[in-house]
C-alpha cells in the first residue's frame, strides 16, 4: 500500500522540541492517513512515531489474521523509543487509533492524549452480531477513503475482515 511506511522522526529545534508524539492510525488504514499531520509536528520540532499496525498497510487477508493485541503490541516499543529521546510524551489516535491511544494511556505513563474522530463504540445493533457473522462471512465492503477534501484520498482496503472488526469491538470494551 502506497504511503504505508511507518514514521520514525527524531526531534529537532523548534517550538515542540523535547516533545514526543506517538500517532496511532485507524482501522484498515496506515501511516499514510496521518502523514501530513505527523509532518507538521516534525516540522515544529517534535519527535514523532507512527508505527504501521500489524495487518495494516498490506492486504485485508493479512489483516484478517490479526487482533487488537497485535495492533497494540507495536505501541509500547514506539513509546519507549520516544521516552528515551524526549522530555514529555503524548499520544494521538485517529479513529480506531483513538482506542489504541486510550489503551496505551491506561497502561503507560503519558502526559496527554488527543483523539481525532475516535472509534470507541457504536449504537448499531448489527455490531453485536459481528462475532457470529465473522464465522460465516469473512469480509464486508471496506470503509474506503472518507476524506471530503477534493483530490485527497486515503489508501485503505476494499474489504473489511469481520474477524478484525470483532477484535476492534473487544478493544472498545477495554477503553470505554
Can you say where each PLM-predicted feature lies in the sequence?
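Gly/Ala-rich beta-loop-alpha elbow adjacent to hydrolase catalytic centers
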Residues: 93-97, 101
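Short beta-strand-to-loop junctions in surface cap/lid or active-site-entrance loops
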Residues: 1-19
Amino acid at each position: 500500500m502506497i504511503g504505508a511506511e511507518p514514521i520514525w522522526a527524531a526531534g529537532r529545534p523548534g517550538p515542540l522540541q523535547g516533545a514526543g508524539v506517538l500517532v496511532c492510525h485507524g482501522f484498515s488504514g496506515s501511516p499514510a492517513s496521518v502523514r501530513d499531520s505527523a509532518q507538521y509536528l516534525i516540522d515544529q520540532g517534535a519527535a514523532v512515531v507512527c508505527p504501521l499496525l500489524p495487518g495494516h498497510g498490506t492486504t485485508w487477508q493479512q489483516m484478517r489474521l490479526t487482533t487488537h493485541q497485535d495492533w497494540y503490541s507495536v505501541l509500547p516499543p514506539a513509546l519507549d523509543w520516544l521516552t528515551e529521546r524526549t522530555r514529555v510524551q503524548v499520544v494521538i489516535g485517529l479513529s480506531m487509533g483513538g482506542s489504541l491511544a486510550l489503551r496505551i494511556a491506561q497502561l503507560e505513563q503519558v502526559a496527554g492524549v488527543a483523539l481525532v474522530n475516535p472509534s470507541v463504540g457504536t449504537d448499531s445493533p448489527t455490531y453485536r452480531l459481528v462475532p457470529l457473522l465473522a464465522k460465516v462471512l469473512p469480509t464486508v465492503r471496506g470503509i474506503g477513503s472518507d476524506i471530503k477534501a477534493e483530490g485527497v484520498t486515503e489508501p485503505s482496503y476494499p474489504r473489511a475482515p469481520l474477524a478484525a472488526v470483532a477484535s476492534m469491538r473487544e478493544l472498545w470494551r477495554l477503553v470505554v
